[in-house]
């Protein structure tokens, strides 16, 4: 995006914010389309197996996790508008390249590069979105911005499966190429305030080499614990639903989950901005905790969907709250590194959940996973938040 010297006042739904939210949505939608469609492509057209299909996700995760902290440093040190343009251009080129990939090795290379671009593109969009928002509406705005990720999570797999099933994998790649071209346009069509896009002044000392924002670590780690529990939900729900004879309800589960987030997001963000984090975080922890207990006890479609609604309300309150706290913990010139630190924590947490919680499910069952372990993680996060909140209050009193 180009520069503009005038800001947009206290308005929330500016063209800049809408464009950045759309950029985030299409990045995440492409990822979820590929998560659903690439395994079918590899196994049916390239005659690979489950291992080869899984490697496509592994290479993407390697690129994302390895690049995320560097992305934050780049965003703070370089011209943010030009960096966003470069990332969205790379996004378009990579989606186009998928149309011409004919071997597993070519797909793996593209997925690795896609992971790197995804880390830069989503971190840049999230950082700029936080900076264009008025401070008085940051909680509400980041909540709506995060909603673009939630919607992509629901829409992406459905679109991917439908395209592959009815039109083939080439149609899926063509669709992603067109989406990426639209992203390139909408991300860069509007001008941004010059003070937002210009690089921060060079720092002295060790902080200029930091790849993690220490001030944002508490909120990032708390968000990581929430996403660790969410990762267990996201990864193993198809298997859990199958064990209950509810495999046909998985898509509807995520639809209910997303709809509840959509319905509650406006007033949750408003409460955060007007009354503070505690008024959304504590109810969010309670709802997320109860939601997992309901999920573990569900045996019918009605109970299954009720658990989805409660989990959606809890997750919808917690996720944007910790992202807002992470960004608010630093000066604007370090927002990129703070955002990258937050997302890096989420990347690692979801990946670690997929790698470890499967062992719990295999040895102790899904009732233990969802009824004991995930609620325990939520309790640990709650206790950590309470301790950190008390420490913050003490610092304010002694200041």
Regions found by a protein language model. Give the residues of each.
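Juxtamembrane intracellular "pre-TM" segments in multi-pass secondary transporters
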Residues: 2-14, 192-222
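Helix-loop boundary and gating motifs at the non-cytosolic
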Residues: 15-54, 230-240
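Residue-level signature of mid-helix packing/kink "hotspots" within the transmembrane helices
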Residues: 61-69, 153-154, 258-266, 351
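Helix-to-loop junctions at the C-terminal end of transmembrane segments
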Residues: 67-79, 265-276
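Structural signature of the two symmetry-related core transmembrane helices
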Residues: 82-96, 279-293
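Paired small-residue
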Residues: 105-113, 302-310
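Cytoplasmic helix-loop-helix junction between adjacent transmembrane helices
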Residues: 112-148
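C-terminal membrane-cytosol helix-exit motif in multi-pass small-molecule transporters
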Residues: 177-197, 383-388
């Amino acid at each position: 995006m180009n520069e503009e010297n005038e800001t947009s006042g206290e308005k929330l739904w500016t063209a800049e914010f809408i464009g950045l939210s759309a950029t985030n949505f299409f990045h995440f939608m492409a990822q979820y389309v590929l998560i659903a469609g690439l395994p079918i492509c590899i196994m049916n057209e390239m005659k690979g197996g489950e291992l080869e299909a899984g490697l496509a996700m592994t290479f993407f995760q390697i690129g994302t996790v390895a690049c995320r902290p560097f992305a934050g440093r780049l965003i703070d040190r370089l011209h943010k508008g030009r960096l966003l343009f470069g990332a969205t251009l790379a996004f378009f080129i990579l989606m186009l390249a998928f149309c011409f990939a004919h071997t597993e090795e070519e797909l793996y290379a593209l997925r690795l590069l896609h992971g790197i671009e995804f880390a830069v593109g989503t971190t840049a969009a999230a950082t700029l979105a936080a900076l264009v928002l008025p401070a008085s509406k940051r909680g509400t705005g980041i909540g709506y911005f995060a909603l673009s990720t939630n919607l992509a999570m629901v829409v992406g797999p459905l679109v991917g499966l439908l395209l592959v099933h009815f039109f083939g994998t080439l149609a899926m790649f063509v669709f992603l190429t067109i989406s990426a071209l639209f992203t390139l346009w909408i991300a860069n069509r509007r001008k941004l305030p010059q003070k937002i896009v210009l690089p921060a002044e060079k720092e002295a000392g060790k902080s200029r080499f930091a790849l993690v924002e220490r001030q944002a670590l508490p909120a990032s780690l708390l968000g990581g614990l929430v996403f660790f529990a969410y990762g267990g939900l996201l990864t193993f729900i198809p298997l859990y639903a199958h064990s209950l004879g509810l495999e046909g309800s998985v898509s509807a589960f995520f639809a209910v989950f997303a709809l509840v987030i959509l319905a509650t997001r406006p007033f949750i963000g408003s409460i955060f901005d007007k009354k503070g984090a505690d008024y959304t975080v504590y109810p969010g922890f309670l709802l997320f905790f109860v939601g997992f207990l309901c999920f573990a006890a569900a045996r019918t479609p009605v109970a299954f969907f009720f658990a989805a609604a409660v989990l959606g309300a809890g997750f919808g309150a917690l996720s944007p709250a910790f992202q807002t706290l992470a960004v608010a913990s630093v000066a604007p010139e370090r927002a990129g590194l703070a955002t990258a630190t937050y997302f890096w924590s989420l990347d690692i947490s979801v990946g670690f959940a997929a790698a470890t919680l499967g062992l719990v499910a295999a040895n102790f069952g899904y009732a233990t996973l969802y009824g004991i372990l995930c609620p325990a993680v939520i309790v640990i996060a709650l206790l950590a938040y309470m301790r950190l909140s008390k420490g913050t209050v003490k610092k304010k009193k002694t200041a």
